[in-house]
């Protein structure tokens, strides 16, 4: 059977419209979890204020020089802030991926679904999803640090891994290997969707500061919710595409 991107886009749009409120609630819950965890594990405001003390920002030629000019205590604060942001983001993304994929599975099986039920049903697979998303994020970031393009290619090749892990109950490394093989064979169908997702995320990042006009916390929740909705659309597309490829 010939698969066209247009038909998968149409199916994705229909599913997203029909399940919008459930997907929105999952996205909002994941955004709230991300922001709360980030706040809990981040350094205090007083500690963050120390990062500006005695650091010659104007004289630093890059991030590496800036970090070198920091005191050991400031470096520890920066490391804690980075770790808190990364950890909370990974947790939120794992719950989002599990919740959205479970919504699709439950709806496809003709069952009624709610945001809490979808997240609860995804609980057994969340540890594996967390490890998978951590590894894929690490690979993509390493690729972006090299020359950007390798990171984008890795993001495309690994896109189907979460769907395979949940739908076929694969292991973490098996889903990574299978995703790379299957995506490479169907690059024309996967690449445009992933590139559109990356572009949408980049545009959202550029305008993220405007959300802080309300309060930093509410702005962070709104920005994360929109980011989660964008990711949810991609997950729906990838799930539908994967099911068609398997037929």
UniProtKB/Swiss-Prot annotation:
UniProt-listed Pfam families: UPF0259 (PF06790)
Cytoplasmic side: 1-19, 108-117, 173-186, 246-247
Mode of membrane association: Multi-pass membrane protein
Compartment(s): Cell inner membrane
Periplasmic side of membrane: 41-86, 141-151, 210-224
InterPro entries referenced in this protein's UniProt entry, alphabetically: UPF0259
Keywords assigned: Cell inner membrane, Cell membrane, Membrane, Transmembrane, Transmembrane helix
Transmembrane parts of this sequence: 20-40, 87-107, 118-140, 152-172, 187-209, 225-245
One Gene Ontology CC term in the entry: plasma membrane
Family recorded in the similarity comment: Belongs to the UPF0259 family.
Protein name: UPF0259 membrane protein YciC
Organism of provenance: Escherichia coli O157:H7
């Amino acid at each position: 059977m010939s698969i066209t991107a247009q038909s998968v886009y149409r199916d994705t749009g229909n599913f997203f419209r029909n399940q919008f409120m459930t997907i929105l609630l999952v996205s909002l819950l994941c955004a709230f979890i991300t922001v709360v965890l980030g706040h809990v594990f981040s350094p205090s405001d007083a500690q963050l204020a120390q990062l500006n003390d005695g650091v010659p920002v104007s004289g630093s030629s890059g991030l590496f020089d800036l970090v070198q000019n920091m005191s050991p205590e400031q470096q520890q604060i920066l490391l804690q802030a980075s770790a808190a942001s990364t950890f909370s983001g990974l947790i939120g993304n794992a719950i989002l991926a599990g919740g959205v994929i479970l919504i699709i599975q439950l709806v496809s099986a003709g069952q009624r679904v709610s945001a809490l039920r979808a997240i609860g049903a995804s609980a057994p697979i969340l540890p594996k999803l967390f490890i998978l998303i951590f590894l894929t994020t690490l690979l993509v970031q390493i690729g972006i640090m090299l020359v950007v393009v390798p990171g984008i290619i890795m993001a495309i090749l690994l896109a189907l891994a979460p769907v395979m892990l949940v739908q076929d109950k694969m292991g973490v490394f098996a889903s990574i290997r299978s995703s790379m093989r299957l995506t490479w064979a169907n690059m024309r169908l996967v690449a445009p969707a992933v590139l559109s997702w990356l572009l949408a995320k980049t545009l959202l990042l550029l305008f993220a500061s405007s959300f802080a006009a309300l309060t930093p916390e509410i702005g962070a929740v709104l920005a994360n919710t929109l980011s989660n909705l964008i990711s949810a659309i991609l997950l729906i597309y990838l799930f539908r595409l994967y099911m068609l490829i398997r037929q």
